[in-house]
Amino acid sequence: MTDSKNIIYINNKKVEVTNVYHDITLLDWLRNYHKITGTKEGCAEGDCGACSVIINKKSKEDSKPINSCLVRLGQVIGSNITTIEGLGCDKNPHPLQMAFSNEYASQCGYCTPGFIISGVSLINSGKVINNDTINDAISGNYVDALVTLQ
């Protein structure tokens, strides 16, 4: 364990990381220590995207989606992590959250946060949004999500 105080920003809120093993996954730390449960564990191998969060180490332009089930807490010290809870809320959802709702694109909803995180990350990247970049952002996902992201 560490006795030093380390900082991570979760959804733009400063969080001190103390007395936690830095080799715990970011996913487990979010869910078990902070009750941020929108980020899910599906496969624990980084293939399904249910655990996706956006990491921002330096600037918004530096942000990218990561699989929180594969990343250790110690690797993200000093970073800003955005989870599905940080994108919007019931009264003020992110436009992509609203689009998923309006298009009935969530199926059971378990992996929907990962789709939305990947989509928001693509939108924020400044890349041209077309079928290729959407497919890259959400590779392996189903047609309704693809149509919604377009």
PLM region spans:
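Signature of N-terminal electron-transfer/Fe-S-associated modules in redox systems
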Residues: 1-150
